[in-house]
A protein has these predicted regions:
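Conserved helicase/translocase motor-coupling segment
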Residues: 7-85, 97
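Helicase C-terminal subdomain and adjacent C-terminal extension
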Residues: 12-19, 123-194
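Structural motif
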Residues: 58-60, 113-115, 150, 158
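ASCE P-loop NTPase helicase motor core
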Residues: 1-7
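Feature representing long, continuous alpha-helical segments
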Residues: 39-43, 64, 68, 72, ...
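Conserved nucleotide-binding/hydrolysis micro-motifs of P-loop NTPases
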Residues: 64-67, 103-105, 118-121, 154-155, ...
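Conserved motor-coupling elements within RecA-like helicase/translocase cores
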Residues: 82-112, 119
Length: 194
């Protein structure tokens, strides 16, 4: 960590977790890579880059297509802006990145924005498929990917999602360890770690 160690307990002005539940018209919050979630994620990222330039930032998308849509949304929102600096002055090697769950290993940043990219299937149906997190082969592939994603932040994790994890009944999640761990992690972040 650049020869600096943040010891626990550390008094900071911001909690280490923040949950942004994206709401809106169903067509904007449903399906894979919901439009409203992409917009909200990039708004938060740009706000962080502008107002906290000392922090390095990354977005982790829970799918390849969702990562592509987030990159497009970032380009759209910054437009012709040339003054947006996307790395801390003292750490130019920690440039802002958007990665997906399967290619984030090895990258760390001060702040990680996790964008789940999975909205409800219909007005009355909760999504049960979460891409690579659904694969519990003998090596617990999905759980390992989730573990890598949630441990990339040095200071803070902010989750952006159309998923309200408290609407899920643990008994209806099936036997998949990764899927259950994902919903439990979302609950943990939404409660700010309590």
């Amino acid at each position: 960590y650049n020869k600096k160690l943040i010891t626990a307990p550390s008094i900071t002005s911001l909690p280490p977790f923040k949950y942004h539940l994206v709401t809106g018209e169903f067509k904007e919050i449903s399906g894979v890579s919901p439009e409203a979630e992409c917009r909200k994620t990039i708004e938060l990222v740009i706000n962080n880059l502008r107002n906290k330039p000392e922090e390095s930032v990354a977005v982790i998308a829970f799918g390849i297509e969702h990562a592509r849509r987030l990159k497009n949304e970032f380009s759209k929102q910054i437009g012709e802006e040339n003054d947006l600096v996307d790395y801390p002055e003292d750490r130019p090697e920690e440039k802002f990145i958007i990665r997906h769950l399967e290619n984030i290993q090895g990258d760390e940043r001060d702040v990680i924005f996790l964008s789940t990219g999975y909205g409800p299937k219909s007005q009355n149906s909760l999504r049960q498929f979460f891409g690579p997190l659904n694969y519990d082969n003998p090596k617990l592939f999905g759980l390992r990917r989730l573990n890598v994603a949630i441990t990339r932040a040095r200071k803070r994790v902010e989750v952006i999602s159309t998923i309200d994890p408290y609407k899920y009944d643990d008994n209806q999640l099936g036997q998949q360890v990764s899927k259950k761990a994902f919903i439990q992690y979302l609950r943990y972040v939404k409660s700010e770690g309590s």
